[in-house]
Amino acid sequence: MNKLKSFLFSLSLLLSYFSLNAQISLNVDLIAAIDRGDSRYSGSWVYVDPLGQEYALVGAKTGTAIYWLDNPDGMENEVAFIPGPSTNWREITVIADKAYVVTDVQDTDHSMQVIDLGALPDYANLISSYDDTFDKGHIIQKDIFDDSPYVYINGTTTTSGVHILDISDPFEPVEVGVYNPGYYIHDCHVRGNLLFAHAFFEPGTDVVDISDKSNPTFLYRIPDPNGSTHSSTMTMDGKYLIVANEQDGRDAIIWNIEDPNNLEAVATYTANNESLVHNPYIKGDFVYIAHNTEGLRIVDLADPEVPVEVGFYDTFEGPSGGFSGLWSACPYLPSGRIIGGERTRGLMIWEWEEHRAGRVYVQLVDSDTQSPIFNADVIIGQDSLLTDDQGWARWGNLNGTFSAVIQAENFFPQTLNFSITEDQKDTIIVVLESSIVPTKASLLKETFSFAPNPTKHQIQIQAMQAAEWRILDIAGKVLLTFVKSSGNHTINLQNLPSGTYIIQAVTAHNRWNQKLIKQD
């Protein structure tokens, strides 16, 4: 009996261990966590030397620590440390063999440090400091996919805007332009000739033309009426922008920005709505997110309108929410290793076992009319989706078998069982049967009618009871919807092209359909 109790206790511990670890990570392995003894860590970036050896740079409380990741003895050891002003916020970027570092500390002579990395792994050294036009910077950025000789500093004391520095001569950086809208810019994202400036205390992100860096020009704003816009990254094709907000409970928003005159928020993402999405970084079809208390998150954006989390490593053991956990992440090493700055644990290095999401696109249609069913519920596990105006619900996950409960007003519910395969897109049409008890056609004909038919411009409808009226095309797509009380009403059809349509009246218990012909 004692042996049995001991076995059960050990089994319980084993199951608890695997349960706990299942919550800590998915498809991501921690290679190393290096705490050099500083009390705080923040920004991080990477460098690859001419021999292909990889390095990680991380902002520590008292300076910038540099680690050699390809040390032959297998240890990721610190090979250089460049002191700087003591701060909780130190940000880094790298262009060619120079690192550029800013700190959010005023009244220092190290507003932007320039560090030569060319002699690594033997040593690195500070070669210049820039303080001509600002004395602190909260964030420094570059065009991640173009090593053009420019850096962009945000959150300075002098303008609160974005300072553009030419670092062609890293010993003598020169400010060539400033985007100064008159309000605070917290961070920015740069791609080609576009600057996305995050106006933290204003309602949105400024999109700025920087083709002439001496004269940054405001183009338009991506709205965010709730403010706290923090950072962003653009998909590789330039069609979508992922915008993060530095506020607990705010999801990242994915915007379709192809047409500045028709901006559309197409999806949102969060790993936990009690936490905030801090900094996103795009690489290929994936966005790598420093998610504060939720750690590193990797999201498949092969279809940006259906973002799917495919990997994570939770770095923080405490409760969700607030300004703890993972500050930064950097996925740009050729080896595929990912590094990040964890606020209290230091440099973290991961390997990711790449997996792509599969997606399913479900359309609900009416069995009687073949028209799409909108505002229907599609419930998959803990996810609850609403069908759009064309009856579509879209969902994704890693490989597996799933079940969806489908519910729509005036239709019998259905359960849909389906499988998802990695990197596959499947379309499923679900036909729902009406739950409305049919009334004899002769009675419906007396209840609803319209004339003339065919018509050129308008029709007169006669209804003995209130109904929702719809005009559908012959494929069942809803073109017009309007609610009318009982009585006689005029419906203007001038904007419809000539053709054959279906006119439909829907009440709580009945649905009436009739063919309608529109002529020129």
Residue positions per predicted region:
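Residue-level detector of functionally pivotal "anchor" positions at catalytic/ligand-binding pockets or at interdomain
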Residues: W350-T369, V431-A451, D520
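Structured interaction patches on ligand/partner-binding surfaces of diverse proteins
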Residues: E409-E433, K518-D520
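Short, acidic Ser/Thr/Gly-rich low-complexity loop/linker segments typical of extracellular
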Residues: T369-F374, Q382-N397
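Hydrophobic beta-strand segments
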Residues: A376-I380, W469
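C-terminal outer-membrane/trafficking sorting elements
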Residues: F9, L398-T401, V405-A408, P413, ...
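Short, solvent-exposed loop/turn segments in extracellular or other extracytoplasmic domains
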Residues: L386-W392, K425, K484-N488
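Feature marking well-ordered beta-strand scaffolds used for ligand recognition
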Residues: A22-D368
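Bacterial Sec-dependent N-terminal signal peptides
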Residues: M1-S25, T439
